From Swiss-Prot:
This is 8-demethyl-8-alpha-L-rhamnosyl tetracenomycin-C 2'-O-methyltransferase. Belongs to the methyltransferase OleY/MycE family. Signal peptide: none annotated. It comes from Streptomyces olivaceus. The active site is at H271 (proton acceptor). It catalyses: 8-demethyl-8-alpha-L-rhamnosyl-tetracenomycin C + S-adenosyl-L-methionine = 8-demethyl-8-(2-O-methyl-alpha-L-rhamnosyl)-tetracenomycin C + S-adenosyl-L-homocysteine + H(+). Keywords: Antibiotic biosynthesis, Magnesium, Metal-binding, Methyltransferase, S-adenosyl-L-methionine, Transferase.
Amino acid sequence: MDSPQVARTLVDSAGGTAAHTREAIRQIGVPETAAFLADELAGRTETVTIRHAAEVQFVFDDRYAPDAADPVPWTFRVGPEGVTHRAGALPDPGAVVTQDLTELARSLYGPAADRSDATRTVWWRDHDDPRVYFDPPPVFPAVERLLAAADGRDVPGLAGLALRHGSDKWGIHTYTAAYEQHFAPFRDRAVTVVEIGVGGYDDPAAGGGSLRMWKRYFRRGLVYGVDIADKSRHREPRVHTVVADQSDPASLRDLADAIGPIDIVIDDGSHISAHVVTAFSTLFPRLNPGGLYVVEDLQTSYWPAFQGAYDDDTRTSVGFLKRLVDGLHHAEYPSRAGRPAQPTDRTVGSLHFHPNLAFVEKRANSGHGGISRLREAT
């Protein structure tokens, strides 16, 4: 399996029973699953309170499976600068954490209510040394940080995640509060997120901060970064990049066909009005009911260099979105208005505007309108 398939298989199975998760692990492979979970655990571990680095051995155990495989040890180095990890055991570990692979996968990728540490054990090398009671060694907080990540006890906000991962969504832009307002119901779901625009322009190594931010925020999510340039260097577990052109409907349709149903689209691409309209017109129909389509940096809709204008021209990004507001009330138009039906009239359920930022919700909107006698009166 490739990385997106592994991620989808684990996330989907973790939403079912433990038997489903065990079967998924068998399909992926025990060592491969352990490596995937080690990457996830390292990425979620918060180290801001760590003062001294320490190494911890984490053993991914499979003893509870009917056809148990050998345990898989990994080594984590937890320090003030972050977390690194590698396959293999330590010769003389200060601490050994052991946990069932299925249980840990379900804790990391399943619903919050299904988290468990019932199979976990922690062995301390110096447990019989009375000095550790008065002078705790660095391995103590290192283990605590890893377990906090495994148990979901660290829930960072988007502003902090944006700063940590180098996303521009907080700072000059102050989008994170609006994102948290609208994305909160999705945070514990197995969502598919598509962001147009990886960042860094043509530099294959630059950008990617927002993709990593979304990965950390949506702990069960799969994140796809779409860019006209090759950004494959930013691929990692649960983050995939795709080369596509947001101005080309065929390119976007191929993208949607490959990804499957989408829950959230974030357009942080070229910001050229024609491209924004094309991307919305192509991808909004592929959005799941209840999903959100987000358009960033709407200030460019007023700038001629981005095909913008100051009026309500529907060819601009803001003008196009204003037309969607009319579509919300499509059932209230008098027949004499002669308003042509739009493809989005019955599928846009709400719009939310913030400075330079808009959220469009996909939801059935097939109301019959108010009292026709009053609507048609002159």
